[in-house]
Structures are given as C-alpha cells and as structure tokens.
A protein has these predicted regions:
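Metal-dependent phosphoester/phosphodiester hydrolase catalytic core
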Residues: 2-280
C-alpha cells in the first residue's frame, strides 16, 4: 500500500520533509525491493524506477481479481491530508482532476469490467471506498473520500459493465468492516458493489490512534455497514463458490502473544445475485 515508500504516499509527491530527488531515489529503491522480494508476476522496474503492479488474475469461471495500484499514479491528497476535516472547508476533494488510479489505469479497469464474464468480479485495492462522512466531517482524505470524482468514475464503470456480484477488497484504515456500496443516480440510490475491509495484523487500531469516541463516529457514518470493528487486529478469511461469498473476520486477542488463538469475530455472506450483505 503506502509504507513500502512512505506514509500515505501519493505519486511522485514527497510526503515527508524531503527533497524531490531524495524522495524519487527512495521510491525507486522501494519498488526494486518490492519486486525482488514479493511473489508477483510483473517487472522488473523501469529505468525511472516505476513498476506496473496493477493487473488481473482470473480463477476459471469463478472469479476475476482486478488488483489495483492506488498509490503510484494518484494525485496528492487535498487539504493537507488531515483527519476529520469539515467537508465545506475542502471542496477540492470533489474536483474531477483528482485521481486515485490515473487515467490509464482507470480505462484499463473499465475495459476489464466490461469484458469480464466470471461469476464474481473482485476489485482488490488499498483504501476504503465507502463514504466515511458524518454531517460535514470527512474522516480521512487519503481514502476515496478525498477523490470523490474518481470514485464516481469507478462506480460508473461498474454500472456500465452491468455486472452483478462485484466485491471490493480494501484495507489501510487499521479497522475491519463490511458494507454495501451505493451510487446516487438521478435521485436514486443504486447498489453498485459490496466492500470488505480487512483490519491490520499489528499496526495501531483507530481507537489507539484517535481514541474510543471514533468507534461511535465510524458506526454512525457507515450506515450501510453490517460489520464494524475499529479495535481488534487480525485478517479476513474468504470462501468463494459459484453460489456465494463468505468472509470471516478473524481477530487475535493479543498480537504480542505468539500462541494467542485466532477466532471468528463475525461472518458476512453474499449470495450470488443478491443485492445486500448478510451478517450471520
């Protein structure tokens, strides 16, 4: 996601007090190390240090995974990349020029969605897609909430492809969650996809970073969510069949204990062809 290079890294814009040249060298070194040590079928990096890592992976007729790169081509975060920013004070987040994927990757995704014919269409990417905006407060501008027009373009691509069973896999926010995704079209909320957000394995939770009140804020703002856990660490375990999708949210009581067991905190299911997630 981002920490291979730098926190909330965006394109070629230094995110820390650092020279442009120093940042470019660090970014190139990060992608070289990533290519050398991660089991990905791409590369090697180009002469300028860039590495195309967005790609699709097909599993027969069951599923196609569109693995996106939401860092290398994105616009810089608007409004100082702050947390809990009044929406009225940050109209820049609505600008059409703001991109999460870059024009070339956006078109690649739209073309891939249109051509896809598997039962499940899976968009695997980094940051939370569903809106986390309460009244006038935007929780995190590094997420798709800071790239509203880009999110609408992705939703348009899904709608235009006329695909059912579209699942979005996300992370980054150090919390777990599951929510249906909707687009506003002609005054009507149109179901577009279903998002599963995996929490961090050991990085600080939102509660640890922002305090316990943030849980109530997230639960209020994520009104379409069927599951939210902003405290525990763990991972997601997914089972996919032609008939349905099951995500088990696994949590560990103590990440400092090698012997701590992993338990199922919640199970969320989606029946093929259905429009809503169901928590069991």
């Amino acid at each position: 996601d981002d920490h291979e290079v730098g926190n909330n890294y965006a394109g070629k814009v230094p995110q820390e007090p650092e020279s442009t040249t120093g940042y470019a060298n660090r970014r190139s070194a990060a992608y070289q190390a990533y290519w050398e040590h991660m089991p990905i079928r791409t590369g090697p990096p180009e002469a300028d240090g860039s590495l195309q890592i967005y790609r699709s992976v097909r599993v027969g007729t069951l599923a196609e995974f569109f693995v996106l790169d939401g860092r290398q081509y994105r616009s810089d975060q608007v409004c100082g990349d702050r947390l809990a920013v009044p929406a009225s004070a940050c109209p820049e987040r609505l600008e059409a020029s703001q991109t999460m994927l870059g024009a070339e990757q956006e078109q690649w995704l739209a073309d891939g969605l249109a051509a896809n014919d598997t039962t499940w269409t899976v968009i695997a990417q980094q940051t939370v897609v569903f809106p986390l905006v309460l009244n006038d407060l935007v929780l995190n501008l590094d997420q798709w909430d800071g790239y509203v027009a880009a999110r609408e373009r992705m939703f348009d691509a899904i709608i235009d492809a006329d695909r059912e069973n579209v699942v979005v896999l996300s992370g980054d926010i150090h919390s777990g969650g599951a929510s249906d995704l909707f687009a506003e079209r002609n005054g009507t909320r149109v179901p577009v996809a279903h998002e599963f957000v995996s929490t961090s394995i050991s990085s600080l939770s939102i509660i640890a970073e922002l305090g316990p009140d943030v849980v109530q804020l997230v639960e209020q703002v994520a009104e379409d969510a069927v599951y939210v856990n902003a405290e525990d660490h763990g991972y997601c375990r997914v089972t996919i069949t032609p008939e349905g999708w099951t995500t088990e949210f696994m949590t560990v009581a103590n990440v400092s204990d090698d012997d701590a067991p992993a338990t199922v905190d919640a199970t969320v299911e989606l029946t093929a062809g259905a429009r809503k997630l169901v928590r069991r």
